[in-house]
């Protein structure tokens, strides 16, 4: 199923059974690729259903999904047409382990630091309002990802 998804539009009308199957396939793909190439496993496995829900409700890339740190964006990459190249994750000239607008228009920022998503999303939202762009902006934050709060 994942090989047939070229954009988030392709998942909008899936049944619950198909969503469950897609979730399992995304998890298996992430586990297989991270097992070979390294990467952020737990943070990505933990947001599979959230990522599917975001892409079903919102219209990416017109609606901007901004990932805090962005190390949990692997399902997002798979749902935005990068499945065919996903095996190159974190390899030279391959898919980045973080969001990267040079890879896809659904990635708005290169990220890698915590707590930048809110300010990035706010800046993007203000810019859109000034341009009368009605696209939505969503910041996805993941707290307590293996770190103790300060």
Label each residue range with its predicted role.
Residues 12, 36, 105-106:
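A short, mixed-charge helix-start or loop-turn motif at secondary-structure junctions
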Residues 1-33:
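Cofactor-/ligand-binding subdomain signature composed of acidic, glycine-rich
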Residues 40-150:
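Cofactor-binding active-site loop characterized by glycine-rich and histidine/acidic residues
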Residues 32-41:
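Asp/Glu-centered strand-loop micro-motifs enriched in Gly/Pro and often flanked by an aromatic residue
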């Amino acid at each position: 199923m994942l090989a047939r998804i070229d954009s988030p539009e392709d998942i909008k009308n899936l049944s619950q059974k198909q969503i469950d199957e897609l979730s399992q396939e995304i998890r298996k793909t992430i586990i297989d690729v991270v097992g070979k190439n390294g990467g952020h496993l737990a943070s990505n496995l933990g947001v599979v259903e959230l990522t599917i829900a975001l892409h079903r409700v919102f219209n990416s890339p017109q609606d901007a999904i901004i990932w805090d740190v962005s190390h949990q964006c692997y399902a997002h990459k798979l749902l935005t047409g990068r499945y065919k190249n996903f095996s190159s994750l974190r390899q030279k000239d391959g898919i980045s382990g973080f969001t990267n607008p040079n890879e896809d228009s659904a990635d708005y920022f290169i990220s890698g630091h915590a707590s930048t998503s809110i300010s990035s999303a706010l800046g993007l939202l203000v810019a859109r309002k000034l341009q009368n762009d009605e696209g939505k902006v969503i910041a996805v934050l993941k707290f307590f990802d293996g770190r103790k709060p300060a």
